[in-house]
Amino acid sequence: MSEQQKTNEAAQTLDGWYALHDFRTMDWTSWKMLSSDERLSIIHEFTGLLEKWGVAQKEGKGSQTIYSIVGQKADFMLMILRPTMEELNEIELEFNKSKLAEFTIPAYSYVSVVELSNYLASGEGDPYENPHVRARLYPELPEAKYVCFYPMDKRRSGNDNWYMLSMDERRNLMRSHGLIGRSYAGKVKQIITGSVGFDDYEWGVTLFSDDVLQFKKLVYEMRFDEVSARYGEFGSFFVGNRLSLDTLPKFLHV
């Protein structure tokens, strides 16, 4: 392999479930104009959809969760994981055709696929048969109190061009970067989804924790790592609180 080929060697990825992050803003003014009975009927229809989608999780064929979002970027986020892009689209359409969707305004969305790269790969045999790898590629979304989502790119500018580094350089940098993430094991669950060719950024990062301050600590600590300091470019951050079937009616109550 030539030096140029070594430099341009692309990381190989293991790909799992497809992911949709769907952010919505409520049209509270129109929502308030409905009668209590109309609102209750719509809430009942929506919780029925959530229960229907939840069957896939019980069968190990996907996962989903819903969080209220803090701030004016959105009011809530649906995160859906499914084996195929078609299934993501079906769920998106099913929600868009629901009564509740008539009282929401699309705020942001992100389409990606759960991804593991060979920067940190180890072991032999078929990785898709490795239980540890499978648990990361096909995760059950946790019932954590808080979520943080943000998209990101690797910089390609002048001397800070990630894609002009050799595979060995990128692997060494990612190994150091990964050590920081692993130091938060038990405090933060992280799901990385790849989106090159799927959306406007290259990766989506979804963090879950029962202590919202861990998001700030983790992201801040990573800012000092070379991967983030030199090569990281970030989009908007969304932070939210978990909604359950029990707390959803309170969220929608007016």
From Swiss-Prot:
The keyword Oxidoreductase applies. It catalyses: Fe-coproporphyrin III + 2 H2O2 + 2 H(+) = heme b + 2 CO2 + 4 H2O; Fe-coproporphyrin III + H2O2 + H(+) = harderoheme III + CO2 + 2 H2O; harderoheme III + H2O2 + H(+) = heme b + CO2 + 2 H2O. One of its GO terms (biological process) is heme B biosynthetic process. One of its GO terms (molecular function) is oxidoreductase activity, acting on the CH-CH group of donors, oxygen as acceptor. Disulfide bonds: none annotated. Its cofactor is Fe-coproporphyrin III. Fe-coproporphyrin III acts both as a substrate and a redox cofactor. Keywords: Heme, Heme biosynthesis, Iron, Metal-binding, Oxidoreductase. Its EC number is 1.3.98.5. Pathway: Porphyrin-containing compound metabolism; protoheme biosynthesis. It holds the Pfam family Chlor_dismutase. It is an enzyme of class 1 (oxidoreductase). The active site is at residue 150. Fe-coproporphyrin III binds at residues 136, 150-154, 177, 190, 228. Belongs to the ChdC family. Type 1 subfamily. Involved in coproporphyrin-dependent heme b biosynthesis. Catalyzes the decarboxylation of Fe-coproporphyrin III (coproheme) to heme b (protoheme IX), the last step of the pathway. The reaction occurs in a stepwise manner with a three-propionate intermediate. This is Coproheme decarboxylase. It comes from Bacillus velezensis (strain DSM 23117 / BGSC 10A6 / LMG 26770 / FZB42) (Bacillus amyloliquefaciens subsp. plantarum). The gene is chdC.
